[in-house]
Amino acid sequence: MWITQEITPYLRKEYTIEAKLLDVRSEHNILEIFKSKDFGEIAMLNRQLLFKNFLHIESELLAHMGGCTKKELKEVLIVDGFDLELAHQLFKYDTHIDFVQADEKILDSFISFFPHFHEVKNNKNFTHAKQLLDLDIKKYDLILCLQEPDIHKMDGLKRMLKEDGVFISVAKHPLLEHVSMQNALKNMGEFFSVAMPFVAPLRILSNKGYIYASFKTHPLKDLMAPKIEALKSVRYYNEDIHRAAFALPKNLQEVFKDNIKS
């Protein structure tokens, strides 16, 4: 048996699977979980793949990309995603997390897939809301958008950031779909003084890129090495990974030179 991952409209990968473990469908999402000899369990959410053995890569990178460039991380907002492992990593800081996800049926179906599902959901500093309007009005130190935001969502979310807050969003991979990344950077630059693309170094099973944006905080100049060294129980993230995430080959430096704001 095989499952197919669409990397771009013109590039696909296939993975061998042994069995389907779960099939859950809601109004807006489809979740299938498969057993794989090489990758443990594989979750397919709306044709995007999550590998249980490698969940820590994205969750560590995004959480500590924000946490280690901020002196304080008191209030965090996560929108448009299901990744509770990201919240688990963020709880390494003294923080409160607002997690916005309307599809409770799909979220609860990840109960056996996310290793820290119960630990996160039962944390007193974790608030799950179905929509942003259900939350108290506040400003955030870090906002993570786990789907590509359109320009209207960017505008709304940036208004919820503190002056030194950090906004991290998913984008297309800069090498695979550089035009899409270029457009995303251009849009982000309409709202932020800092807008820089990055990827997860050595992550071979992903088609994702990301953007780090802020009014004043810089992902490299404001990196705090002592905070990185103090992190416990991390398997992927370190200072070298953080810095390498922003490295671009010469040709992409030229492509993005008018869109990167640093």
Curated annotation (Swiss-Prot):
The protein, known as:
Polyamine aminopropyltransferase
Q: Which species is this UniProt entry from? A: Helicobacter pylori (strain Shi470)
| Protein's UniProt keywords contain Transferase | yes
PABS domain ranges (all copies): 1-249
Query: What lineage is on file?
Result: Bacteria, Pseudomonadati, Campylobacterota, Epsilonproteobacteria, Campylobacterales
Keyword presence, Oxidoreductase: no
Enzyme Commission (EC) number:
2.5.1.16
Q: In which pathway does it act?
A: Amine and polyamine biosynthesis; spermidine biosynthesis; spermidine from putrescine: step 1/1
InterPro entries from the UniProt entry: PABS, SAM-dependent_MTases_sf, Spermi_synthase, Spermidine_synt_N, Spermidine_synt_N_sf
